[in-house]
């Protein structure tokens, strides 16, 4: 995302908890700040993308990044967090005269590299219109889904769907293998069937091979399903399939000694 902003000609100042992760951006022309506040204090637009709600609160509130933003600046958060946290950030921004969009992304590493991410946006239309040139450097679609919190709501729904699809294929694979049919035969049919999907086109071969390079880590998908279940409980919505999948992901996460892709949920049937 940062490299695409630089390619589009935007001046960029960055910070990362792990300095090595920022080195490609620095080599490409970005400036390195010593802390989040140092990024925010001169920014017209501040983009945050961190791993979980705790990290976002640490960056925005504990580090002082939010209070360092000047009046009239815009904060875009592309992390995946709860809608409630997005609304709390929006309220804190409003108190300081800062505009806010919750804009989590989908598209994975490939989409980020190609500049073809989809931003799921919650906030005001006029704010989205103003920052659209920045988003266009990183993505291809920016639907406005509603007020602040709507972007995070849709993102949690989408990731729940991805988690369920991969979990369902893992069960399918376990059944077919357990009944004595090679996985390769299943793949012949799967790839010509209506069961195909974008995520399974990528993840199913990984699951058959038992190789799980972390395009989207299991620990992050586990977090996102948990957030979806928490939102469902708050709203009185029953998610029986989501709850069952969460237990499966939880067991695999606790027993995995590496940091695998979420397609490693298939390990549940090999334990």
Which stretches of residues belong to each language-model region?
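NAD(P)+-binding Rossmann beta1-loop-alpha1 motif at the extreme N-terminus of oxidoreductases
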Residues: 1-48, 68, 72-73, 78-79, ...
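Active-site-proximal catalytic alpha-helix in oxidoreductases
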Residues: 115-122, 143, 147-179, 188-202, ...
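Residues in the short beta-alpha loop(s) of Rossmann-like NAD(P)-binding domains
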Residues: 17-18, 52, 124
């Amino acid at each position: 995302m940062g490299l695409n902003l630089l390619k589009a000609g935007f001046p960029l100042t960055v910070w990362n908890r792990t300095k090595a992760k920022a080195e490609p951006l620095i080599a490409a022309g970005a400036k390195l700040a010593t802390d989040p506040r140092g990024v925010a204090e001169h920014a017209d637009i501040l983009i945050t993308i961190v791993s979980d709600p705790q990290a976002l609160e640490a960056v925005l509130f504990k580090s002082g990044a939010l209070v360092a933003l000047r009046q009239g600046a815009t904060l875009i958060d592309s992390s995946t967090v709860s809608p409630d946290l997005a609304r709390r950030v929006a309220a804190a921004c409003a108190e300081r005269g800062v505009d806010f969009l919750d804009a989590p992304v989908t598209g994975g590493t490939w989409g980020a590299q190609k500049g073809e991410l989809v931003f799921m946006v919650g906030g005001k239309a006029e704010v989205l219109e103003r920052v659209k040139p920045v988003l266009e450097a990183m993505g291809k679609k920016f639907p406005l889904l509603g007020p602040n919190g709507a972007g995070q709501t849709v993102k949690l729904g989408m990731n729940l769907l991805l988690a369920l699809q991969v979990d369902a294929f893992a069960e399918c694979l376990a059944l077919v293998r357990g009944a004595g049919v090679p996985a390769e035969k299943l793949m012949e049919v799967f790839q010509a069937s209506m069961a195909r999907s974008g995520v399974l086109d990528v993840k199913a071969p990984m699951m058959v091979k038992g190789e799980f390079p972390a395009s989207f880590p299991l620990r992050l998908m586990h977090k996102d399903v948990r957030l979806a279940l928490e939102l469902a409980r708050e709203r009185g919505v029953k998610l029986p399939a989501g709850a069952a999948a969460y237990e499966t992901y939880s067991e695999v996460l606790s027993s995995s000694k590496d940091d695998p892709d979420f397609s490693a949920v298939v390990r549940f049937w090999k334990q």
